[in-house]
Amino acid sequence: MYFLNQLIFQDVSVMSVDKREDMSRSFQKCLNLRYPIIQAPMAGVTTIEMAAKACIAGAIASLPLSHLDFRKVNDIEKLKLMVSQFRDQVADESLEGNLNLNFFCHDIVDKPTDLQTANWAKLYRKSMNVPIDMNEIKFDNGNVSFKAFEKENALQDFFQYLSDGFRPKIISFHFGHPSKSTIEYLQKIGILIFVTATSVREVRLLARLGINGIVCQGYEAGGHRGNFLVNDPKDDENLSTVQLVKRTVDELAEMKNKGLIHATPFVIAAGGIMDSKDISYMLSQQADAVQVGTAFLGCSESNASKNFSSPFTRETTTKMVNIISGKPARTISTPFIEKVIANFQGEELPPYGYMYSAFKQVRKKYPELANFILAGQGFQNVQSGITTDKKIETMGARLKIDGK
């Protein structure tokens, strides 16, 4: 699979617009795809069935792996089982490699302090008006960072599996990037590295690292925002998807012309992309492909499909909040979300991973009260009951590339 690197790393930065638009076809050809679409790796939502249907339909399938902890002996076996089930459902050796394994790569944080957990309990008791027994809440880190695996030398079995066994075409990272040595090793064995960016600063850093694809996550995107150079949401420029794509294309072209990078990574648009018109527009703005998430929330294979069995009113909106999980995330605005926002007074809360784990325990006990429905702008147009493959085929069949 090493040939993929040779095909992907093309000099596209100084192409004309027409030639640059051909990159969507190059993306498809290099990765053996029918459509320039990546099914987003939505933690807690994406299922193996969804990924398999996306792959069969001709898109890149994605499996979110933020729940795995390679420091534990059995978790590499969990990964192997997931991949095995995916391959069995795809049942086509020519397609099964069209897979993206996604990891969270945030900075390693300390365990929460007593003050942080006490503030959290006070906020939730006031917002939910229910008794919360702190003796029943465990502040465990439910989302271990890939950086922790690197730091503790816990990647040997994973790398061995990739080297000797199944190799996905893409491994991607959210909330940050792995070490240069990890990137180079994975590329050497023929795996493409994609990383999420939300700003031009992040794009510039990732391009210098030599990654293969930049997932440009616009502010309208649902789920957790993948920024890693901005710690305070007030410092986030909140670029829309199209503005981030345009500025990324320009930045990469300038870096290439100045000799700062030797090859230009693919530009992947992500955020607010709901149908073929949205996809066609992003491709016309020189994106090489798109990553679609919210549009699949109502699909029959989605773990979130029950939330979309009945249509939302047009008045229902989304909010970007960082006080549920500990990181900014776009969620559907519900009475619970509004109460938490109203009651929060800037108190210090537990860090991401620990706070999110505590919330999930409360949600399990009070599912009707603690609802955190991650979705992007345009979620009102989510189709309910459609299968993932049918959704992709419908979007793909109506695509317009180069005006055709």
From Swiss-Prot:
Function: Catalyzes the oxidation of alkyl nitronates to produce the corresponding carbonyl compounds and nitrites.
Residues engaged in binding FMN: 41-43, 270-272, 293-294
Protein name per the record: Putative nitronate monooxygenase
Additional record remark: Present with 172 molecules/cell in log phase SD medium.
EC number: 1.13.12.16
Active site annotation, chain numbering: 224
Main location: cytoplasm
Cofactor(s) recorded in Swiss-Prot or TrEMBL: FMN
Annotated catalysed reactions: ethylnitronate + O2 = chemical entity + acetaldehyde + nitrite + H(+)
Keyword Oxidoreductase: yes
UniProt cofactor note: Binds 1 FMN per subunit.
Enzyme class: oxidoreductase
Keywords, comma-separated and alphabetical: Cytoplasm, Flavoprotein, FMN, Monooxygenase, Oxidoreductase
Family matches, as Gene3D superfamilies: Aldolase class I (3.20.20.70)
GO molecular function: nitronate monooxygenase activity
InterPro entries, alphabetized: Aldolase_TIM, NMO
Family according to the record: Belongs to the nitronate monooxygenase family. NMO class I subfamily.
PANTHER family in the cross-refs: NITRONATE MONOOXYGENASE-RELATED
A single Gene Ontology CC term: cytoplasm
UniProt: substrate binding residues: 224
Residues of the signal peptide: none
Compartments where located: Cytoplasm
Highest taxon above the source species: Eukaryota
Organism listed in the record: Saccharomyces cerevisiae (strain ATCC 204508 / S288c)
